[in-house]
């Protein structure tokens, strides 16, 4: 199982970015959670058995690749810090409130 934690900076809150992340993750079969942090960043925990899908998902989050021709229309990602992570397995991908 491949698991990562991403901290996404830029204009990523209040612009539908978390919903874009959810749609993109579900299309790729990625499981995990996404939420807003108090410092204006968005945090993502993502897991999959397929390393290539995780790389594709990371590229979509960074804005380097579109998800089925879509990019997050109002978000402006300026930085993504990604690192391997250890967390309990998820069975879906949703927003954590």
Curated annotation (Swiss-Prot):
Q: Which PANTHER family match?
A: ACYLPHOSPHATASE
- UniProt gene name: acyP
One molecular function GO term is: acylphosphatase activity
Q: What is this protein called?
A: Acylphosphatase
Q: What is the lineage of its organism?
A: Bacteria, Bacillati, Bacillota, Bacilli, Lactobacillales
InterPro entries in UniProt: Acylphosphatase, Acylphosphatase-like_dom, Acylphosphatase-like_dom_sf, Acylphosphatase_CS
One matching Pfam family, short form? Acylphosphatase
Q: What's its catalytic activity? A: an acyl phosphate + H2O = a carboxylate + phosphate + H(+)
User: Which keywords does this Swiss-Prot/TrEMBL entry list?
Assistant: Hydrolase
């Amino acid at each position: 199982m491949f698991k990562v934690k991403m901290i996404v900076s830029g204009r990523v809150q209040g612009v539908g970015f978390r919903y874009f992340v959810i749609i993109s993750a579900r299309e790729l079969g990625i499981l995990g959670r996404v939420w807003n942090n108090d410092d204006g960043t968005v945090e993502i925990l993502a897991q999959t058995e397929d390393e290539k899908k995780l790389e594709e998902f990371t590229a979509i989050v960074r804005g380097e690749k579109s998800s089925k021709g879509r990019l997050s229309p109002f978000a402006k990602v300026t930085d993504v810090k990604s690192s391997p992570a250890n967390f309990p397995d998820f069975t879906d991908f949703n927003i954590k409130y």
